[in-house]
């Protein structure tokens, strides 16, 4: 005798916050769902995941041959930004200011702000701006970025526990941007940063989390379990300090692992280098979205097209 299967949708009386990035008629909204990722059998998804294209203030230095080919003919940051915005499947442009790193090129804040303005003037799509990853420099740099982008409703990535007062207050209060809150793959650290940011006076619905990332195969299980726990607490326990949507910068992780960086001369049996980089980027982004990311940031046009 066959037993009938009656599916009962899992309904939560809670939602992930819907956060809109961008201004005018060029906006994207991330979050807003009341179900686990891709559980469309429980409820319709309010906003499908979004994809950003990463570009750097360093131009095309150090990028793969396939990426260079896509940007052929682009000589200025404005040119690069326009091509990124036009990429098939792109929802927004993410500018990373890696040249500001004091342990690297150490560009001045004025130089970096000039790049931010050039990119902002070149494209009208939603903008995400990432700092240089140095907490002291970002504490000075990102408030100036927030000031330069007034009126754009941009996402500023990211404040951390060490510099949230400077960045959170500037981006979230003084200049009315969206605050990216970055923690290191730990639900308690993610929640604590959201709590202290809202205590500054920043609206919880103007915060997007970057809970940390890794390339697939590189301690990646921690990323999955952390996202899983965050979504579980946000929806199952209606924890409003974990209901911020999640954005994950994927490309910075995946293009730096040996599978993507080893040359074909060194590793002929691994196949074409560009394809390996795309594979790492696609599989990591797909896993991030399945685990709970509401947006991912990618670099290669093939990756963007595939994930979209």
Language-model segments: residues:
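Catalytic beta/alpha-barrel core
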Residues: 94-96, 105, 126-137, 151-164, ...
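Short, well-ordered coil/turn segments that N-cap beta-strands
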Residues: 47-51, 89-91, 123-127, 150-154, ...
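Catalytic alpha/beta core domains of metabolic enzymes, predominantly
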Residues: 162-307
């Amino acid at each position: 005798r066959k037993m009938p299967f009656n599916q009962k949708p899992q309904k939560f009386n809670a939602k992930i916050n819907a956060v809109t990035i961008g201004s005018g008629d060029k906006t994207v909204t991330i979050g807003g769902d009341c179900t686990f990722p891709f559980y469309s059998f429980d409820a319709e998804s309010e906003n499908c995941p979004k994809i950003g294209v990463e570009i750097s203030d360093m131009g095309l230095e150090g990028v793969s041959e396939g990426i260079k080919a896509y940007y052929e003919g682009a000589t200025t940051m404005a040119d690069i930004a326009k091509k990124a915005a036009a990429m098939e499947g792109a929802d927004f442009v993410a500018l990373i200011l890696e040249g500001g790193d004091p342990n690297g090129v150490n560009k001045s804040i004025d130089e970096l702000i000039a790049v931010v303005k050039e990119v902002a003037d070149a494209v009208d799509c939603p903008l995400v701006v990432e700092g240089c990853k140095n907490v002291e420099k970002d504490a000075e740099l990102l408030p100036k970025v927030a000031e330069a982008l007034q009126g754009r409703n941009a996402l500023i990535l990211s404040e951390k526990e060490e510099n949230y007062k400077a960045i959170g207050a500037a981006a979230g209060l003084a200049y009315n941007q969206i605050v990216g809150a970055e923690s290191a793959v730990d639900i308690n650290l993610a929640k604590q940063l959201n709590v202290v940011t809202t205590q500054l006076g920043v609206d919880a619905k103007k915060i997007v989390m970057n809970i940390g990332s890794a390339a697939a195969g590189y301690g990646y299980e921690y990323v999955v379990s952390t996202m899983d726990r965050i979504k579980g607490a946000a929806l199952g326990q209606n924890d409003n300090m974990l209901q911020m949507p999640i954005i994950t910068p994927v490309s910075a992780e995946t293009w730096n692992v040996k599978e993507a960086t080893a040359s074909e001369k060194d590793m002929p049996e691994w196949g074409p280098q560009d394809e390996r980089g795309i594979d790492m980027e696609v599989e990591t982004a797909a896993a991030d979205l399945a685990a709970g990311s509401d947006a991912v940031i990618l670099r290669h046009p093939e990756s963007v097209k595939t994930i979209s």
